[in-house]
Regions:
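Cofactor-binding beta-sheet edge motifs in enzyme active sites
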Residues: 2-27, 35-234
């Protein structure tokens, strides 16, 4: 793992320079997004949600909401950007719900689409968001059990005691994690340890797209709204 300084504070969570370096490959397919997946695991709808940071909220049942910060205009960042967060958070992708983040320059930077820059500019911020959430959950569990964080590990949304039999899910400890201070440093995974990035996942909006569900600006409607168009280019 690689240690990096988070540069976060509690409520302005990620005012970070996201001038990322390095490229990556995330696998997903428009076609698989149109296929029914009978193996998808189900998680009960939470009774309560806990906001861990500006990218992540966790339900008491273990359901995870990850916010995708950049506009989705067909380039599939609404799938790929949350995958980066989920990788470092160490959660089961089948338990993740993706939501489009609102415009909020206090939380996010570079909220635009163009030039194939979304991943490139947000790579560091997305990874740190996931890693910071994971660290806060670990610290909450360590405090609950009165053990060092180094005695704990995570796997797909479950915290385990390395030398014991105790386990606790992210959903069970999330309420305690919201009170944990943002760590000054977090450990990022080595690229060789990626389990989610590089795999093929369905487009999160694939089913909505092929069934005509409202998704885009063109779908917006308000009572009394009038439409206009340009007759010819200015």
């Amino acid at each position: 793992m690689t240690k990096v300084k988070t540069q976060f504070n509690r409520r302005s969570f990620i005012k970070i320079s996201a001038a990322a370096g390095g490229g990556m490959l995330i696998g997903f397919s428009w076609l698989t997004g149109c296929i029914s997946d009978s193996k998808t695991e189900t998680v009960e709808v939470p009774n309560e949600w806990f906001e861990i940071n500006g990218y992540i909220k966790i339900g008491d049942t273990g359901m995870i909401t990850i916010y995708s910060p950049n506009p989705e205009i067909g380039q599939n960042v609404k799938t790929s950007m949350p995958m980066i967060v989920a990788e470092e958070l160490d959660v089961n992708w089948e338990h993740v719900v993706v939501e489009q983040a609102p415009l909020n320059t206090g939380f996010y930077q570079n909220q635009f689409a163009g030039g194939s820059l979304s991943i490139r500019l947000s790579w560091d911020a997305l990874r740190m968001a996931g890693a910071t959430g994971r660290r806060m959950l670990l610290e909450a569990a360590a405090k609950e059990w009165s053990v060092p964080v180094s005695d704990l590990s995570t796997s797909l949304g479950i915290i385990k005691e390395k030398n014991g039999n105790r386990t606790i899910t992210y959903g069970e400890i999330a309420s305690k994690a919201v009170g944990i201070e943002i760590p000054e440093e977090v450990e990022l995974k080595d690229l060789k340890d990626f389990k989610l990035i590089g795999t093929s996942k369905k487009n999160v909006d694939g089913k909505k797209i092929i069934t005509g569900k409202p998704l885009f600006g063109l779908d917006f409607n308000r009572e009394g709204m009038q439409l206009a168009m340009i007759q010819h280019p200015p």
